[in-house]
Swiss-Prot record:
It holds the Pfam family DHX37_C. Belongs to the DEAD box helicase family. DEAH subfamily. It comes from Caenorhabditis elegans. Residues 246-412 form the Helicase ATP-binding domain. Its EC number is 3.6.4.13. It comes from the Eukaryota. This is Putative ATP-dependent RNA helicase rha-2. Residues 138-160 have a biased composition (Acidic residues). One of its GO terms (biological process) is maturation of SSU-rRNA from tricistronic rRNA transcript (SSU-rRNA, 5.8S rRNA, LSU-rRNA). Probable ATP-binding RNA helicase.
Amino acid sequence: MGKRKTKEDNASEDYDANELMIVPGEKRKKLEKSGEKSATGGKKNRNFAKEKEVAKLTKQAKRKLAAVQSRKALKQTQEELFAGLAEFQLDPSKLCQLSSSTKLSKEPEKAPVFPEKLKVFSGKTKTEAKRTQQDYYPTDDESSSEEEEEEEEGDNDIEDAGNTVEVKIEPIDLDDVDEAIDGNPETNLDQIVVKREDDEESDNEDILALPTTTVINRKKVIVERSKEIQKSRAELPIFAEEMRIVEAINENLVTVVCGETGSGKTTQIPQFLYEAGYASEGELIGITEPRRVAAIAMAQRVGVELAKPDEVSYQIRYEGTRSETTNILFMTDGVLMKEMEQDVMLKKYSVILIDEAHERSMYSDVLIGMLSRIVPLRSKTARPLRLVIMSATLRLDDFTHKKLFPLLTPKVIKVDARQFPVSVHFEKRTPDDYIASAFRKTCRIHETLPPGAILVFVTGQHEVKQLITKLKKRYPVVYETDKNGEVLVKGTKEWKEKKVEAAKSIKLEDFKEETPETEDFEDVDDGLMDGDDMNERGAAEAFDDYEEFENGDGDLSDGKVENSIGAPPADCEPLYCLPLYSLLSMGKQRRVFDETPAGMRLCVISTNVAETSLTIPGVKYVIDGGFEKRRLYDSITGVSRFAVCRISQASGDQRAGRAGRISAGHAYRLYSSAVYQDFVKFADPEILSKPADQLVLHLKSMNIVKVVNFPFPSAPDEQMLESAEKRLCRLGALSESTKNGKTEARITKLGKTLAVFPLAPSYAKFIAMADQHNLMSHAILLISLLSVREPLIPVSSLRGDTPEETKELMKNVLKERRRWCSHTGARRLGDLKVLMHAASVAEQIKYNARECEKVGLRVKALVEARKLRQQLTNIVNASCKKEHAAALDSDLPPPTDQQAQLLRQMVVASFSDRLARRVDRSVGQEEVQKGAYETTLIKGHVFIDPCSVVFTEEPEFVIYQELVQVNEKKLMTSVCAVDKEWLSRLAESYCNYGEQDKNQEPIYDPVKDMVVKTVKVTFGPLNWELPNENRSVPHDIMMYRYFALFLLDGLVFEKLKEYTPKLLAPPSTMVKSWAKLQKRTEMLLNKLIEKEVTTRSSLKEQWLKNENWLLEEYLEWVPESVHQQISLMWPPLEDHEKTIKMGRNKKY
């Protein structure tokens, strides 16, 4: 405390004071980087900067300084060299379009270039340009001193999670970095980002979240083509875009190619990718088509152009040519969906092309949604997957929105079509009858305008036939024979030349009366007559509809149009009229592609099938009626109907574009421009207008529980998806379960079985049930016929040469169909039996077109049904373990009475939602039309189709396959009669059960094997009354008491009945309020509760495990005198129910 300070102490205090004065000097980092040690002490006011200048450099420092100076000199020389080369550099706008072959697209698409720098190191670059690709390279970190750098060399590399720019990857000395900064004061220091430890976690999350584009060095393929093929390819608009398209696909995970129909997208892009090496390492190039015809035709065309038909295959619903040598595979979108169920990552494919995406079919929309999640996952593997969406319209928002592709932005490439200019002509006033207007417009074009094919768009087959009939009548094909015996067609160019020559050498004696021979150019049995389907309008009464059709309606039928435009010119050339619609046979559809007879003008009358699916050659004039016939489906009620609706603006533009394929054309729109402006821009996609049951089931089978959250390009209505889930739950394909307070519908074992079949779930269930009674062949036959469109020609569409012949033909066909199901047992199977017999008749006559048409069969639909039948047979044999494989029997015998009854019961179990009940006209004051039915789906009355074989019988309950609205009526098609008593047992999920009467005594139902009470039963929301039903009592202690009562009473096991009179207490003791006071009742009750035994089957299971189970408890109820007898008999099963081991472990 009182110690005196010495001189040394004072010196120490001075030293400490000086130390405090130089502490701030440590903060100057640049001094630390010089390599000299910092001061630790010294004299007061010491000048360290001056001492550093005069200090001698060590040998090591001199070497480092010399190295730095040499690098600076080298850098200056290289900068001068780069400055000289920059004079010969391409313009940046052209340079960005080229792709480097040395970097293999490791850079982002719009990577900034730094030509003024010698070297560029990796690091985060703050730019506004949006990056679509990322690679992560290590880079050197800055250290606080050179000594720390030498000590920690190799440990300070970091991984940058930002966008990187890499010109040359090599080790970089920090001295170079310092010199670059010092020598270039304009360098942005923010470009050099040092990762901090606290940023590591977030950067890792970014790496996982954002997909990367890995470009693989693929082996290019050289293809040798003929000169003709090369010339035809060069004429396509897309051919000049090969480099741009291939580079975009290489550098982007998803690419959208937009080009007009006919630009060559479908045939050329697969060849571009093939040559780029996308199939060089055993992977496939997959192309999906919405139609089977397109898949087959495109595969054949690409195979010819590549000169390698073995490497280009197709796979459609019923057939395919896929083999081990296949490299390019065309398929329908449904085929790829089924393949995705087995391999969700599509590991066999290197690229998937979705063609005709603008048509928005249900499967293509689901495929795009699935691939939008698969592509980012595959990008993290060694073999990434590319997705190419090809569309013919500019509606691209549906394919690029963020909900569909949240982690990336698809690259959009627009291909300009080599379209000739098309002049679009609107009507000043929209006509009321567009058919009459189309007829007038066709006549004026044919009579006044230059040559060129005419394409007329109408709504349906009825309009096609009506217009062709009038045009053929006005412009018939007339044959004349000249004096040399040569047959010529009147009006053709050759005929006119012959007339001129004949006029020069005319003589009076050559004149004589001749009658020209007039006949149709086509045969009488042209598919035009037979292909009509007036059932779209309806068939209230067959011949009445026929007369209405023949009489016609509007101006076109009464001759006013012909009178208004006058007679055609005498030398007018004939008009070669052809129909085109979807139900026309393939052979007759192909006639529009054949060469037009010489001297005639082609005129195609078509539905909207010619809008995008087919390109008709030579079309110069298009007449657009502005209407189309759509099949509208109510997702809630299930009612479908055909309705004539206005087209969309996109459809109108597609139709007009058909006129500009070969030369400048004209499009005549039979509506005003104001009406066109009122059209919707785009039609609703198919996924919004079709039942979603099959869609939901397929998504559930892929473990997609929340279908509502699926990334659809155009999301269906939530109510539509929920209704589909409810129907699937009632069908047994889904089951609802609650987890964490949330109710979810998950797929069941039955649902997984149904998802195997390419059918609606109700149809698939019908086949799944058929194996129980050896009805698989009959079930497959019936479902294949129900799955195709109209295998039977509607009676109202049949035609004869005269009205009398037509009436007789309708009568005979309807009589023949009723004869097919005249057998007593099969009659109630109704129209389903007619379909099965029709297939048998078609097999017998070998699907001969003429013979089938005589009995009212549509050959095209029956052939399609046979292919589906073969496919379903193969699926059953491959997927189901059966002792006897199902066979495609062409001589399948008709179902017997018992089989017909079983088939009707299967119909009830599978199609319960399509039940209808006949309205009792004697009940209620409202006047009800005869033959009216009511159904659970819609309000109002429905009726059986008059052409149905059960039309006259009017069963009380029927099940239909479809409701079709015809005029003011809703008609049920494919009707089958069912029994009322089956509903509560086979359609239990649709039944409503009343409350059990508390005063009613339960009984044991040996059929259901449960303790039951009788309750009232009603069906559906309309509460149709059904016979009373026995329902299980609540699962509580009283259920166990009553089961024990019936067990003691001998009602459960017949062998115990003889001991009932000998019981020490009546069995009713079990249900008394004081029963727990007796030991025997509690012992028996507790034993049953312990194993939860309330049925005969569950009790039998316990005896199979332990044959003495419940013996001790039962012996408490009987006298001791019968104990040994009961012990020998126990368990009281029938002899055939006992196993061999029973009796070895008896207790006596």
